[in-house]
């Protein structure tokens, strides 16, 4: 026997007819339609909304509204003000390793970010992960340059 598209049939018992509720006792789901005798779940307009607990104060309203959740994937920096860079010699290339070697920073765990507090009198080439706008302006006013690295 060859299989043809027009001769295909589904297996016996694999497709069940939809149960028609409320169409007489002989239909199997007449009268109360399988919802029981009385109560909220047997009435029309059911079901109740998600989270409804029968009039009891629901869980989502009992639990306090918490604030100050931690920032996900927060970037942390080792910060340094421009005024601290005056301790270095003119024309120095400044990076995280040099700052540790000179004793300006101790045990840095995060990338370097330069902040713009204070004044700068020394011309430097600063390599950092981030600069504030005021820090970048102060470094470039003196004749230095800012280099970003990731």
UniProtKB/Swiss-Prot annotation:
Keyword field: Ribonucleoprotein, Ribosomal protein, RNA-binding, rRNA-binding
This protein's record includes keyword Ribosomal protein: yes
Pfam families given in the database record: Ribosomal_L27A
Molecular functions per Gene Ontology: rRNA binding; structural constituent of ribosome
Signal peptide: none
Cysteine pairs bridged by disulfides in the record: none
Entry superkingdom: Bacteria
Biased composition (Gly residues): 25-37
GO cellular component: cytosolic large ribosomal subunit
Subunit composition and interactions: Part of the 50S ribosomal subunit.
Role: Binds to the 23S rRNA.
Protein name (Swiss-Prot/TrEMBL): Large ribosomal subunit protein uL15
Lineage of producing organism: Bacteria, Bacillati, Cyanobacteriota, Cyanophyceae, Synechococcales
Gene this protein is translated from: rplO
């Amino acid at each position: 026997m060859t299989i043809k598209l027009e001769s295909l049939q589904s297996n016996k018992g694999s497709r069940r007819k939809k149960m028609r509720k409320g169409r007489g006792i002989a239909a199997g789901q007449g009268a109360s339609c399988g919802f029981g005798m009385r109560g909220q779940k047997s009435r029309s307009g059911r079901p109740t909304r998600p989270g409804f607990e029968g009039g009891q104060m629901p869980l989502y309203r009992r639990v306090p509204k918490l604030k100050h959740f931690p920032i996900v994937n927060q970037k942390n920096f080792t910060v340094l003000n421009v005024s601290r860079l005056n301790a270095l010699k003119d024309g120095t290339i400044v990076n995280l390793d040099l700052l540790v070697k000179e004793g300006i920073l101790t045990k840095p765990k995060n990338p370097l970010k330069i902040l713009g507090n204070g004044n700068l009198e020394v011309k430097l080439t600063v390599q950092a992960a981030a600069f504030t706008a005021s820090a970048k302006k102060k470094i470039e006013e003196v004749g230095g340059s800012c280099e970003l690295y990731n």
